[in-house]
Amino acid sequence: MLIYLFEWLSHYFKGLEVFSSYISVRIIMISITSLLITLALGRPMISWLQKMQIGQIVRDDGPQSHFSKRNTPTMGGVLILSSVIISCLLWGDLTSIYLWILILVVIFFGAIGFFDDYLKLVLKHPKGLRAKYKFALQSIFSIVLAIVLFYLLSKNGQMSLSIPFSKSLYIPIGIVIFVVLAFFIINGSSNAVNLTDGLDGLAIVPVVLVAAGLGIYAYIETNSTLANYLLFNYLGNPGLAEVAVFCAAVCGSGLAFLWFNSHPAEVFMGDVGSLTLGAVLGVIAVMVRQELIFFIMGLLFVVEALSVMLQVGSYKLRNGKRIFRMAPIHHHFELKGWPETKVVIRFWIISLILFLIGLAAIKVR
């Protein structure tokens, strides 16, 4: 919205055209805007959640240190999502279909997460939205979206899978493989981030790092000069560069949310935030054709999800025997005696290392 205003004003005031003509400037501005919006609205929202008594539910079989988290305001993810949408409407190119798709993903998965949180925290339904209904909604949306993206992104009905650390190795894939891959990436990422969001600040920092990494890839691949220099396939689809702008909005809002979510957390994002942010990262990875880079950068999320699947499988197949003391795996380390802050910071370090490995693939090819 603002780019059109600055484009008009640039006819009368020299220099303002940088705000409409340069995507790098808009990336900086949208990250600052989303950060400031989240910081400004954070305190009022926390107060409102406290007033409405929308607080965290703590498992009785969890670490004793978690009992102090009971009734901590939850559903703070609404703050992140609202900030991202507002910032995108202000600084995004509203002619980009990819920007609108990402906003639609935020709204749809945000609605699922919001309804799930509302059932658990307000209506006091212990399990919230039933898993089968949640999975069905996620699946239908992901499949439809994958089909749409295939026809938007494909060339002559063909797509390719980029292989990290390789200059020219691309695996051609058709619509069936693409849809199946996108389905697992979007749904898997959504639920993996949701499982990771179990300690103060644990999930939001890896989310910001992965969003930043994918944003860098989006910027490179949609810039013909950079793409050619770094030997990437140039993605010249009109409007696809707005993915980098969207990623910047997620980074800005996520960093500001950490201000309130760091230990001791004043607010949790809830399912409305974690389910949505995970889905958004998955969709972005599919859009910029960097699914394997996403796997590398987001490996922490994968490990968290795998720990739950292994725990459940072991319990069912081995007559109640468990692999971990508690799943997801961050709780296992807590029950081993690691302080919560140590678990979180060590997981952040791992996430940072994975982020750097993912960035190294830009040049080490």
Swiss-Prot record:
It catalyses: UDP-N-acetyl-alpha-D-muramoyl-L-alanyl-gamma-D-glutamyl-meso-2,6-diaminopimeloyl-D-alanyl-D-alanine + di-trans,octa-cis-undecaprenyl phosphate = di-trans,octa-cis-undecaprenyl diphospho-N-acetyl-alpha-D-muramoyl-L-alanyl-D-glutamyl-meso-2,6-diaminopimeloyl-D-alanyl-D-alanine + UMP. One of its GO terms (molecular function) is metal ion binding. The keyword NAD does not apply. The chain crosses the membrane at residues 22-42, 74-94, 95-115, 133-153, 168-188, 201-221, 240-260, 267-287, 292-312, 342-362. Its cofactor is Mg(2+). Keywords: Cell cycle, Cell division, Cell inner membrane, Cell membrane, Cell shape, Cell wall biogenesis/degradation, Magnesium, Membrane, Metal-binding, Peptidoglycan synthesis, Transferase, Transmembrane, Transmembrane helix. Pathway: Cell wall biogenesis; peptidoglycan biosynthesis. GO terms for cellular component: plasma membrane. Belongs to the glycosyltransferase 4 family. MraY subfamily. Catalyzes the initial step of the lipid cycle reactions in the biosynthesis of the cell wall peptidoglycan: transfers peptidoglycan precursor phospho-MurNAc-pentapeptide from UDP-MurNAc-pentapeptide onto the lipid carrier undecaprenyl phosphate, yielding undecaprenyl-pyrophosphoryl-MurNAc-pentapeptide, known as lipid I. PANTHER family: PHOSPHO-N-ACETYLMURAMOYL-PENTAPEPTIDE-TRANSFERASE, PHOSPHO-N-ACETYLMURAMOYL-PENTAPEPTIDE-TRANSFERASE HOMOLOG. This is Phospho-N-acetylmuramoyl-pentapeptide-transferase. It comes from Francisella tularensis subsp. tularensis (strain SCHU S4 / Schu 4).
